[in-house]
Amino acid sequence: MHDNDVNPLKLVSKLGLNRRQFFAATTGVAAAVTLTGTAAKAAPGANGVLIPAPRRGIILYTVRDAVGRDPLTSPYASGFKEVLTELSSIGYRQIEFAGLRQHANAEGGADLGTVAGATQLRAWLDDLGLQAEGNHGSVPSTITDANIAAFDTACEIANILGMGHIGTGSDPTSSAYVADWEAAAARWDFYGERASRHGLKLYTHNHDIAYSFLLDSGPLDATGRPTRSSGIRRLEHFLANTDPKHVYLEMDIYWAHVAQYKHRTFTAPDGSTVQSVFDPAGLVAAQTTRYPLFHAKDGVKDTTQANGYVMAPFGEGDIDYSTFLRRVGAKGSHNPMWEQDTAPGGSAAPGQSLEFARVSYANMAALRG
């Protein structure tokens, strides 16, 4: 039997810790965390469920320690089958993969990214009442016959798994320059159209840098590149220059709020400093159907940190998910995947990521607006 049934609230009491001390000890969060969780608070007069039960999801990167550990040496849930069983019992119904590899000793072997492996994985998903929604794989960096063939194979695997989406956890490019973003847009249009032929939506992900400002104007540097900005954010330019029928976005809401905190000013062509505060929900609301997936990642405000936030279980941070989900429109049609990069507790707390999965699911279910 796998020992994954520790109630985190009982553990807090047993250890004589308050919730702030508990999360500081287990995740390095040094800021206060409330017992009820900011995200789980309903707005006055609002009582509608914001994330319907069939759309409460998780990306397996959050529990990567559990997927990757050796079942022969650990008493905890290990490998895809056992971890998916645990997540299903918690209540999750959607799964986003972060690759298709697990520990070699887990049932099914190390690599399930084959036709046989995906068929086995699909059987487990179906048995557990889980729906695969997407995968953080890779979108080829060039358009070649070999890369096209590899992408088609990835789409075939996605279809075996029953996914509606296929994507990546990386930004389309790390460049600050228009030419590179337009090249990325052309490449994504190509592969997005190809994904559409397979019945899939191709999506990209964001980190905070993707919502910083393009360098697209002003004096040129020694290499002939612009040094100032017109105020357009990188991923906004990408969105405007890709085909909405073939290219979609998964907003990582935590990183979008980090961008709101960090990327607030730009140097205009005339050399003046201009303030422009990013509005993540407003951006989504303008084209809400282009954002079929979210990373529902929470964070505690901490201005001593460069990012302005420290990651926390969903509902235990300061990102106002009730307001965000109300503002973006198309209520109940998005697919929020809970993610917490810092959930794995290492050898000191091997059951932590799955415990945080329980806490986060409860807060997702309680969210009203």
PLM-predicted stretches and their roles:
Residues 1-17:
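N-terminal secretory signal peptides
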Residues 195-313:
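Acidic/histidine-rich catalytic cores of soluble enzymes
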Residues 58, 87, 125, 158, ...:
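Conserved, mostly hydrophobic/aromatic
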Residues 16-21, 32-48:
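N-terminal twin-arginine translocation
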Residues 48-80:
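Boundary/entry segment of secreted carbohydrate-active catalytic domains
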Residues 54-60, 95-97, 132-137, 166-168, ...:
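Hydrophobic faces of well-ordered beta-strands that scaffold small-molecule active sites
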